[in-house]
Regions:
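Alpha-helical elements of Rossmann-like donor-binding domains used by nucleotide-donor carbohydrate transfer enzymes
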Residues: 38, 42, 155, 180, ...
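A general structural signal for well-ordered alpha-helical segments in protein cores
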Residues: 36, 90, 178, 209-210
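N-terminal glycine-/serine-/threonine-rich beta1-alpha1-beta2 phosphate-ribose binding loop
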Residues: 4-136, 161, 218-219
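Residues at alpha-helix caps and immediate loop-helix transition turns in enzyme cores, especially N-
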Residues: 35, 129, 152, 206-209
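Rossmann-like dinucleotide-binding domain that binds NAD(P)(H)
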Residues: 192-225
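A contiguous active-site-proximal alpha/beta segment in oxidoreductase catalytic domains
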Residues: 4-6, 10, 141, 146-205
């Protein structure tokens, strides 16, 4: 069965009786950011313990090894392809997370996967990294921060207006510890000042602070320092 929408045909022969496993590509790695390791493990639900022990990010070794095995893995999704800026990193990520395919160019995954994850945290690079997949209508998850300058934000807004499929977020928005306050802060009284602790640089990690607060207080900030 084919269903056409906006000039495109979507194959639905297995829907809704069967769910086809989504094939994902993990793309990019920048200095100080080990997300390709941890995200691939979390999605695939498996890892090579001996290879993980050689991961250059001690924090990832620590929290992955402490995580109960049955909490890892996303049903009907698998990272099947990986590319990193340094080819040696891709080889190690693939070994750790048992990823089947290493590509020499990120564009090589177009037509091979259902979606890509741009796993880098330099906001000024994200328009360039995402452009080929936007052009090919491949859905994208973009690591935070989405961008760090107004001109790139305007490009992302244009893509939103055009109906392109991408998302970027801090996990802090979804922390269960804050969920009670997403609906009501009445018991806290009138909120006039909010202080949130964040790590490292504002450019890369400030979004964690903002995404913690925004679902609680909503829009209307008068000052941020």
């Amino acid at each position: 069965m084919e269903v056409g929408q906006h000039g495109k045909n979507y194959i639905m022969s297995n829907f809704p009786i069967q769910k086809r496993k989504l094939k994902l590509a993990m793309l990019g790695m920048t200095e100080g950011n080990g997300h390709p390791y941890s995200w691939s493990i979390i999605i695939n639900g498996k890892y090579n313990a001996q290879a993980l022990a050689k991961c250059p990010y001690a924090a990832i070794i620590d929290y992955i090894s402490k995580q109960p095995q049955n909490t890892l893995g996303i049903e009907n999704a698998e990272v099947t392809h990986v590319w990193t800026d340094d080819p040696q990193d891709a080889m190690h990520v693939a070994e750790v997370a048992e990823i089947q395919n290493i590509v020499s160019n990120p564009k090589d995954v177009i037509g091979e996967v259902d979606a890509v994850l741009v796993a880098t945290d330099i906001g000024s690079e994200h328009v360039e990294r995402c452009q080929p997949f936007i052009d090919a209508d491949v859905p994208i998850f973009i690591d935070k921060p989405l961008c760090d300058n107004l001109s790139d934000l305007e490009i992302f807004q244009k893509w939103i207006d055009e109906g392109k499929n991408f998302i970027s977020s801090s996990a802090m928005r979804y922390c269960k510890e804050y969920e009670p306050y997403h609906q009501s802060t009445h018991e806290l009284g009138d909120l006039r000042y909010v202080n949130v602790t964040m790590a490292k640089s504002w450019e890369k990690y400030g979004i964690h602070a903002l995404e913690t607060v925004y679902p609680i207080v909503g829009p209307g900030f008068e000052s941020i320092q």
